[in-house]
């Protein structure tokens, strides 16, 4: 365990809200640290890196993976301290009003303010409940789709009946040789339009059924077939398969808020109840992105940037009450003067 230097602001969470907060903290000349529990920055967008995102103002359709790349590059503009693979367990406040952030690693971080930007929380996929299944996670048992190329010309089965499962099935139909969908109930829970498209597709659906056995090729360490059990008839169907995709939802880890001794007001036992200015019930602690809840809250990536601006400006005013309410716009901000000259010179080459 080691103790670290003081920061003006510590951002917990490295998704869109946290990354943009990092950039804007730098613009407001705050000493900034960002802590992310996963090994990489980007947040939940890593679940759909090849999905196209259309609803960010001024940004033409962009893949999730490319958006992460650009957000990270922007977040690093002012050289914040970045800690990845660092899970925060609790946030406390000492007698001097300083936030004490304790990580699972034993590290203790100190900060004048905190911005919580953990989105829907640390989300862990619901694993398939078959003994020994985890050994196939390095080969052809998947809990997300990071690249469609992996599934090209392959037989794929998807287990799940929600929006994500059906969406993946429809998209994989374009690249896979055969797509199966299995769901334990008789009706899917996806959107009606998705179900209609699925019904009219070549995807083979098995309802009231679930995967009960993974049949392996022990020499290659891969699944070569699955056994489907129909709960109504008891029929067991064996299907040869190249890739298995499990979409059973996620388990939300709310350990951070539960463990923190601060009386952070919550909504629905998880979300931080706040204001349009991203303030929480704890002075100096702010929230941005999907973790924040208030009556006017919009759950879009674009709205996460808006939350980040409010959170950073509120944090700046908290530690420096005479500071301006907002930062100077980038087009007229001297902080970018040298960078703008460099960009201009490069454009003239």
Curated annotation (Swiss-Prot):
SUPFAM superfamilies: FAD/NAD(P)-binding domain
Cofactor: record remark: Binds 1 FAD per subunit.
Protein EC: 1.18.1.2
Catalysed reaction equations from the record: 2 reduced [2Fe-2S]-[ferredoxin] + NADP(+) + H(+) = 2 oxidized [2Fe-2S]-[ferredoxin] + NADPH
Cofactor(s) the protein requires to work: FAD
Keywords from the named record: FAD, Flavoprotein, NADP, Oxidoreductase
Protein name: Ferredoxin--NADP reductase 1
Binding site for FAD: 36, 44, 48, 88, 123, 290, 331
Top EC category: oxidoreductase
GO molecular function, one term: flavin adenine dinucleotide binding
InterPro entries according to UniProt: FAD/NAD-bd_sf, FAD/NAD-binding_dom, Fd--NADP_Rdtase_type_2, Ferredoxin-NADP_redctase_2
Family under the similarity heading: Belongs to the ferredoxin--NADP reductase type 2 family.
UniProt organism field: Lysinibacillus sphaericus (strain C3-41)
Known partners and oligomeric status: Homodimer.
Coiled coil: none
